[in-house]
C-alpha cells in the first residue's frame, strides 16, 4: 500500500467532476487500499478519489474509532429520505484545520457497488448521512466551504494559501 497526496483547497483539481467507475478490478482495489491508508494516516473518516487526484466515483469511509468498519462506495447514488435537515460541523482533509456548520438532509439512501463490484443499499442518518453527502459533494467538484458565506470562504482560502507559501 502507498500513502497518496491529498489535494488541498483552493487546488482547482478539487473542482473536477468524477466519472463513473467502469471496471472493478485489482487495480481499483489497490487504489481503495491506498486511499484507506491515506485516510487513516491523515487522520480522517472519509476520502473521495477526487481528493487524491483520481477523478472517478469512489469513496472510502470508516467512522469507527479503531478503524475496523471500512466502507467502500463505488458509483454511489443518493436519495434523500426526508425533508428534515440536520446541521453538522464539518471538516475536510482537503481544507485542513477549518470546521464549519453545514446543513444537509437528515436521512438518505445510498445505492452503490462495494469493493468487489456487488451492488448494495444502505440507509443513513446522523454522522453517516453527513459524511456520505460530504464525500459525494467531492465527486461533483464541491467542497463544504461552498456552503458558507463568500466572506468566510475567501478568508479560509487566504489562510490556506498563506500556509502553502510558508511551507514552500
From Swiss-Prot:
Removes the formyl group from the N-terminal Met of newly synthesized proteins. Requires at least a dipeptide for an efficient rate of reaction. N-terminal L-methionine is a prerequisite for activity but the enzyme has broad specificity at other positions. HAMAP family: Pep_deformylase (MF_00163). Its EC number is 3.5.1.88. It is an enzyme of class 3 (hydrolase). It comes from Alcanivorax borkumensis (strain ATCC 700651 / DSM 11573 / NCIMB 13689 / SK2). It catalyses: N-terminal N-formyl-L-methionyl-[peptide] + H2O = N-terminal L-methionyl-[peptide] + formate. This is Peptide deformylase. One of its GO terms (biological process) is co-translational protein modification. Binds 1 Fe(2+) ion. Belongs to the polypeptide deformylase family. Transmembrane segments: none annotated. Keywords: Hydrolase, Iron, Metal-binding, Protein biosynthesis. CDD domains: Pep_deformylase. InterPro entries: Peptide_deformylase (IPR023635), Peptide_deformylase_sf (IPR036821). The active site is at 135. Fe cation binds at residues 92, 134, 138. One of its GO terms (molecular function) is metal ion binding. Its cofactor is Fe(2+). PANTHER family: PEPTIDE DEFORMYLASE (PTHR10458:SF21).
